[in-house]
């Protein structure tokens, strides 16, 4: 029974066998044309190569720069902290434990004010925005830098 199962007609394409005589349609040069770099074994050009003319990516001007002094923070918005209980001490370890952040970046955690905070929370984080500080103080919370 199982040995008789076959795929539907047209479901499996027959592989094109190369270099098997002129009658096959892909004999002799096997679809690679006559001589040249592309006909050789392992031959070909690198991505972006345009035959010797200045490539497109070199013709367009450079833009921007990479700031080596950039500080990277794990961002937490106030709206994401609604799941916490009142009077909780919010620090990096708690945020990781509750899966509010995936990882702690080199400079720690920064609190931003997106979303609404209704619970009184105490924060001990690396950095915070002015607006976040205002919203935390408004609901009776406390924030300090560790």
UniProtKB/Swiss-Prot annotation:
Organism domain of life: Bacteria
Biased composition regions of type Basic residues, renumbered to the chain: 9-19
Residue span of region Disordered: 1-46
Record-linked Pfam families: Ribosomal_L27A
Example of a GO cellular component annotation carried by this entry: cytosolic large ribosomal subunit
SUPFAM superfamilies on file: Ribosomal proteins L15p and L18e
GO molecular function: rRNA binding; structural constituent of ribosome
GO biological process, one term: translation
Keyword Ribonucleoprotein attached: yes
Record bears the keyword RNA-binding: yes
Entry keywords, A to Z: Ribonucleoprotein, Ribosomal protein, RNA-binding, rRNA-binding
Comp. bias intervals (Gly residues): 20-30
Protein role: Binds to the 23S rRNA.
Assembly and binders: Part of the 50S ribosomal subunit.
UniProt record similarity statement: Belongs to the universal ribosomal protein uL15 family.
Protein name (database record): Large ribosomal subunit protein uL15
Organism listed in the record: Phytoplasma mali (strain AT)
């Amino acid at each position: 029974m199982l040995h008789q199962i076959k795929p539907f007609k047209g479901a499996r394409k027959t592989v094109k066998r190369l270099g098997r005589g002129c009658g096959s349609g892909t004999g002799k040069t096997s679809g690679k044309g006559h001589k040249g770099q592309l006909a050789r074994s392992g031959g070909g050009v690198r991505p972006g190569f345009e035959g010797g003319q200045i490539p497109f990516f070199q013709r367009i001007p450079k833009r921007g720069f990479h700031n080596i002094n950039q500080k990277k923070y794990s961002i937490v918005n106030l709206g994401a902290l609604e799941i916490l209980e009142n009077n909780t001490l919010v620090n990096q370890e708690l945020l990781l434990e509750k899966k509010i952040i995936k990882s702690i970046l080199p400079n720690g955690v920064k609190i931003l004010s997106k979303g609404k905070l209704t619970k009184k929370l105490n924060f001990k984080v690396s950095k915070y925005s002015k607006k976040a500080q205002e919203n935390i103080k408004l609901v009776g919370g406390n924030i300090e830098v560790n």
